[in-house]
Amino acid sequence: ILAKKMMGAGGGSIINISSIAGLQAAPMQAIYSVTKAGLIMLTKAMARECGRKGVRVNCICPGVIKTQLSEALWKDADREKAFAAQKALGRIGDVEELVGAAIYFASDASSFTTGAVLTVDGGMVI
């Protein structure tokens, strides 16, 4: 519905938030991973369908970010250390670190970007 309104209004930017789980399989997360992979493919399909009407559709795929949802992974110092060790940057991300990606996709700086999937994961999926 939103995409149709944006196409009728001359364009815009849709930013989907998926997860690195949609790019890389993880134990005991089949359903979560399938839904996130589906959102990535929806992003690409919508980018193709909406692009000529001026609507850009892109996707941000965060890794483990310190939120209430992921609290069990970082609240305990030993678990946080184990998850941080899996990343090239050696730490878990903060919510504020997603802002730059969102601003880029929402702004004219990404006027020639559509169907893109940007990982913001500290180098976990390399």
Annotate each language-model stretch with its function:
Residues 11, 53, 91-120, 125:
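C-terminal substrate-recognition "lid" of short-chain dehydrogenase/reductases
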Residues 19:
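Residue(s) in the substrate-gating loop at a strand-loop-helix junction
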Residues 77-97:
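Catalytic Tyr-x(3-8)-Lys segment
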